[in-house]
Amino acid sequence: MMGITDIETDGTVVGMDVSKLELVGFADREQEQFSCPNSSGAIRRLGKRLAKLEPKLVVFEASGGYEGLAVSIFTEIGLPTAVVYPKRVRQFAAGLGVMAKTDAIDARMIAYYARVAKIQPIPPHSGEL
């Protein structure tokens, strides 16, 4: 059984909650909340800002494809990204007694879930078949 001392604490994990119109994020080590419109230019600016944090992982909750643009852009600029199932994040949050559901809370829970579950980034595309 994993104990609290087994949870890695090195590097920042960023949780991203995505909707059609907006991305809401949370950087766990910095305890920083942020948001931006779900548009190419805004996502690129956010990606550059996040790159300065040198995150070990940026995690998106699957949201019917609304996360696709951000995942693509973040991967392109070299940020380690992953996508997780919403049901698992909700079960994790419920296990912690967090029943409220807002974009800000979701982003925080995504980051915490990714750290505890040791989610790994999507492998970079090599360009080879």
Please state what every model-predicted region is.
Residues M1-L129:
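Phosphate- and other anionic-substrate recognition elements at nucleic-acid/protein interfaces
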